[in-house]
Amino acid sequence: MELNDLISKTGQWLKGTGDHGDIVMSSRIRLARNLSKKPFPNKARKKDLQDILAIVQAAVKDILFFKKTILLKMTELDNVDKQFLIERHLMSHEHANNPEGKALVVSEEEVLSLMINEEDHLRLQVMESGLNLNETWKIASAIDDALSGKLDFAYSISWGYLTACPRIPARRCEDPS
């Protein structure tokens, strides 16, 4: 799969086929994770970011959820491609900036996207069409479990998963409002 394959079709979450698709466009769950014993992206050096990218890249290649995905390195994308990915809600504006050591993994149907080295080492996003939070959560949780089987995440018994941004809860869903 290539980026042009995404451009030529509509993402699953945009089709309006889910529950209450006439009212609710999509359901989205996002999880932030960081690797233990690695500096968070805002404190990482270029070499650290490249090492983290290589570690995550090696982990996802063996996980079933990532079999029909494409890995896009931000240094290899032009501004038009980055804007397309932002408009499809597959990555943030911040991820497009300072592209060194950053990548995006996107599934064929755009249900799954994984930003590597944005504000956190991993920003997992799952989007489904319509009002479908339960199924969206099940998918996100299963992917998170698979990733945690391959990667050692930064975790505190007191605080939960450690994130770069205190606004993002470590143990519950984020309220985007």
Label every model-predicted segment:
Residues 160-175:
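Conserved phosphate/anionic-ligand binding catalytic regions in large, soluble enzymes, centered on
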Residues 1-158, 173:
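Long, Pro/Ser/Thr-rich low-complexity/intrinsically disordered regulatory tracts in eukaryotic proteins
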